[in-house]
Every structure is written in C-alpha cells, then in structure tokens.
C-alpha cells in the first residue's frame, strides 16, 4: 500500500483513569453548595485564600516517599532547574507554606478558607478518584482549644446551612493527647517506642474497617486477611490491648470520663488532653451546641497519626443503600484537628494551627440523597432564530438578543446553519429553550416579532384533543411589536414558572411578569 492509500489514524478520545468530566448540572450543584459553605465561613470572620495547584514536592512533607523519584502518592514533575514539583495532595500543606513564607505580613491569628482540587496518585476505583475537591477552613496562630471548639461549631452550622437537620449529623471530637497518655500508661512512652506507637496508631485507624476484633489482632500478634496476606501486629499483650480498646470503644464520654482520667492519671500529656476535651465540651454547650450536635467521642481515630491535639469529624447519621443493597450509615463527610507541627517545619519555631476539610464530592452525594441539592431552577436560554443572513437582519437579531440579556433574561442567537429553519426549532427543543423569537422579512417590514412559547406549544400538541380545549389554552405563539419584546417574553416566562409551581404544589400561585429576569434580590 502506497502513502496515498494510507488513512490517517484517528486519535482515540480517552479520559484518564481516575478522573471525571463535570457537566453543567454537577457544576451548578457544586457552586450552589460551596456558596452556602462560603457564607457560613464569612460569617465566622474567615477570609479566602488561593494557592497554586503545584508546590515544591518537599513542601508536602510526609507525602514525599522518594527524594530521587517522588511519584508515589503525588503527581510530580521536574522543573528546568531540576527541582521537583508536585500537584497538591491537600490544601493544608500549601497553607503551611504560605503562612511560613509570608509570616511577617500575616496578622495572627490568621483565619482563612480555601476551596479547590487536590490530586492523589493512587489506584482509582469505584467512588475513588485521583482528582477531587476539598473545602477547608483553618486558624493559624491560636493555641487555645477555644479555636478547636469554634471549628466544631462552624462545621455544625455549615451542615445545617446546607439543609441537613439536627439528628442527621453529629460532630465527634477526640484528642490525640489522650491517646498519647493511654500509650504512655501502658508502657509505650519514650523515643525508643516510637515505631511501636506508630503501629498502634495505624492499627486503631482500621477500627471502622476491621472492627474491635480485627484491631485487637493488629495490636497483638498480627492479622491475616481473606487472601492469606499477613500484617504484622504491634506486639502488645492482652492487658495493653484491653486498655487501648477501652479508649477507642468509649461511646458515652460522660459515663467513661472518670475511668479514662484514672487510666491517664500518671501522664501529663494524657491529663492535659482530658482537660482539653472537657473544656471543648463546656464551651460548645455554653454556646448552645448540645451532644446531639457536637459530641466528645474517643472512638474518633482517623488522622490521629497526623494531628497533635483535638481531632474532630463530621458524620452524617442517616441510612443509605450501598452498592450491595444494604442499609448503611452514610458516615464521614469531613474532619480535621490541631496540627501544631506543620507550619513549624518551615519556621523552626512552634506555630499552632487547627482546621478542617470538607470532602465536597462526598457531601454533594449526601445532599442529593436528602434531596437538598440540585433543586434550584435553571431556565435554558430564549432562542432568537435567524431567518435572513444579511448584515442588516443579523444586526437586528443580535440587538434583540442583547436587549433580552440586558433585562436579565438568558438568551442566545442561533449560531448554526440558519438556512434550515426546522433545524433551529429542533435545536431549541433539544436544548430545552422556553421561548423562540422569530422575525422574517414580513415581520421586519412592520417592526414586529413572532414569540413562540415552546413549553406551552409542546404541551398543547400532546394534550389538546378538541377545539374547545384549544381556545381555553394559553396562546402558544403571538405577534408583538419589537418594542414590547422584553415585556412579552417576561410574561411568557412568568406563566411558565406558575405552571411549574402549580404542577409541583398542586395549586396556582400569583406571579408578577415584571420580576422575571430581575437580578435585584430585593426587588
């Protein structure tokens, strides 16, 4: 086969594994949700901050597995100056870098929120993506646990602002210092036990996955999974295991507080942690946040390896059906805690900090389950059709389109092949356009337009069976002077809105055509 006979190979359109395209509905739903979150954060006095998607890899701290080839866990590339850069793994490490780099200009305590995508170079799976959005809030430079208490209250207020009612969520609070006290009390204090302490932390982090029995094996000799793979345990004896399981198994802090205080009584750090938990509990209760909203709960174990003090988690308590058809509690949608060591990595001096992160995609799934998201109405644009292609006619069509837009009405002029008018109406139907504007030569000569109610027209064609019904129905197409274009379109859109409300609520609601397209919230 010669070169002339060879067909060029078509490039295959492929979405990279672990990534998703976001369509208009999802984008609008996220925007609706994040606007409500942002409003709560602003009311608490937090200010926005934006950091780049890339950071120097060494700024990511514990996520740097290999200084020569840092490509595990993060997406990395080497700059032209041979320095490694990585897509951010979370929003906290970039904040720490920003604070350290601008420490002399920042007013402490520094209260900030950030929203954006983070990236994980991990094996993708169902519901597990390599790019996802987080929404964080942090206070840097506030050493007192009142800052942690405020974070918990802000998390509760955020969930309620999104429509999640009390009883369907709880903010659970624990303290890393209490666990440190427990570990010291069972003989795992000191630098020489650091490795064993780390194994204990990793074991109890699996509590949700393996339950108390599985964690007991990981705390002791080790655990073999279904495939036969063996995970070596932390090597604790039965008495040590029982004390650790008592701590992470506490469900009623009030009933267990005395015994817990006795367990850590000989450790300064453990006693301090218990005092901090009690202080947080007293603060939130005084502010009107009872245990139905914010609960001291030592069973919160996620992130204890990372945090240095209080740790908190937002959990949704209602049931959903999983992929297997089983009823399960929805679970965590965000969490955080105190991380006093992260900023100080750059500073060489202690810089206290606390904050939390909301998993936007997971929370959006929860809100859709509750019917709290995506209900806001998005009206497709009015379509100004094109009957003639000369400059004068095109100018008129564009002028009409701009008049509608200036009045706050979504509008577009048809940009396809205008010579086949039927295709324009097909486009309008598939697009879901509520109204079409038509002006041919005859209409242009008398300065009028045809205004076609596409929603009513579709209903009439499907429902009306006799002439009497037709006469009683709303007019689906009418002629109007060009000067009345905006007013007539508003009138039709208002009538359509009333029809939608009547269909949704079962009764007619009054409407004011003058308010359609009005962008003033106080109108």
From Swiss-Prot:
Catalytic function, reaction form: tRNA(His) + L-histidine + ATP = L-histidyl-tRNA(His) + AMP + diphosphate + H(+)
GO cellular component terms listed in the entry, alphabetical order: cytoplasm
**Could you state one GO biological process linked to this protein?**
histidyl-tRNA aminoacylation
Name the keywords, alphabetized: Aminoacyl-tRNA synthetase, ATP-binding, Cytoplasm, Ligase, Nucleotide-binding, Protein biosynthesis
Keyword Cell division belongs to the record: no
Q: Which InterPro entries match?
A: aa-tRNA-synth_II, aa-tRNA-synth_II/BPL/LPL, Anticodon-bd, Anticodon-bd_dom_sf, His-tRNA-ligase, HisRS-like_core, HisRS/HisZ, HisRS_anticodon
Q: What PROSITE patterns does the record tag this protein with?
A: AA_TRNA_LIGASE_II
PANTHER family recorded: HISTIDINE--TRNA LIGASE, HISTIDYL-TRNA SYNTHETASE
Q: What is this protein called?
A: Histidine--tRNA ligase
Can you name the source organism? Rhizobium johnstonii (strain DSM 114642 / LMG 32736 / 3841)
């Amino acid at each position: 086969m010669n070169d002339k006979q060879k067909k060029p190979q078509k490039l295959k359109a492929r979405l990279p594994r672990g990534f998703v395209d976001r369509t208009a509905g999802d984008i609008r739903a996220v925007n609706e949700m994040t606007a409500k979150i942002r409003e709560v954060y602003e009311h608490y006095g937090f200010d926005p901050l934006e950091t780049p998607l890339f950071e120097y890899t060494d700024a990511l701290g514990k996520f740097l597995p290999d200084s020569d080839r840092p490509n595990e866990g993060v997406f990395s590339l080497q700059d032209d100056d041979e320095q490694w850069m990585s897509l951010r793994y979370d929003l906290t490490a970039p904040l720490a870098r920003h604070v350290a780099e601008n420490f002399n200009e920042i007013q402490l305590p520094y209260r900030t929120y950030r929203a954006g995508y983070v990236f994980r170079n991990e094996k993708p799976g169902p519901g597990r993506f390599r790019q996802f959005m987080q929404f964080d809030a942090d206070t840097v430079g506030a050493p007192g646990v009142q800052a942690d208490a405020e974070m918990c209250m802000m998390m509760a207020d955020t969930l309620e602002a999104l429509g999640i009612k009390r009883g369907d969520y709880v903010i659970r609070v624990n303290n890393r210092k209490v666990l440190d006290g427990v570990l010291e009390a069972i003989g795992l204090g000191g630098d020489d036990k650091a490795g064993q302490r780390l194994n204990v932390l990793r074991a109890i982090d699996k509590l949700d996955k393996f339950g108390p029995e599985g964690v007991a094996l990981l705390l002791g000799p080790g655990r073999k999974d279904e495939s036969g793979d063996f995970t070596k345990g932390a090597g604790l004896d039965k008495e040590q295991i029982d004390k650790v399981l008592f701590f992470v198994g506490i469900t009623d802090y009030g009933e267990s507080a005395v015994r817990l205080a006795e367990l850590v009584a000989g450790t300064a750090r453990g006693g301090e942690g218990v005092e901090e938990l009690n202080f947080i509990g007293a603060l939130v209760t005084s502010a009107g946040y009872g245990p139905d909203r914010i609960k001291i709960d030592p069973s919160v174990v996620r992130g204890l390896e990372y945090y240095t003090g209080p740790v908190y988690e937002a959990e949704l308590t209602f049931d959903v059906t999983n992929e297997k058809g089983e009823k399960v509690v929805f679970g965590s949608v965000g969490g955080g805690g105190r991380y006093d060591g992260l900023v100080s990595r750059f500073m060489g001096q202690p810089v206290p900090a606390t904050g939390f992160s909301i998993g936007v995609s997971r929370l959006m799934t929860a809100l859709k389950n509750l019917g709290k998201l995506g209900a806001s109405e998005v009206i497709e644009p009015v379509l100004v059709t094109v009957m003639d292609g000369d400059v004068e006619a095109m100018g008129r069509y564009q002028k009409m389109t701009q008049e509608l837009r200036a009045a706050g009405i979504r509008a577009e002029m048809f940009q396809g092949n205008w010579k086949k008018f039927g295709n324009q109406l097909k486009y309008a139907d598939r697009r879901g356009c509520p109204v079409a504007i038509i002006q041919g030569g005859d209409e242009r000569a008398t300065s009028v337009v045809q205004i076609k109610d596409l929603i009513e027209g579709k209903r009439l064609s499907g429902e009306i069976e006799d002439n009497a019904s037709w006469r009683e129905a709303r007019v689906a197409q009418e002629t109007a002077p060009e000067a009345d274009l905006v007013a007539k379109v508003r009138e039709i859109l208002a009538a359509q809105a009333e029809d939608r409300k009547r269909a949704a609520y079962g009764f007619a609601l009054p409407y004011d055509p003058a308010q359609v397209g009005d962008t003033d919230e106080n109108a």
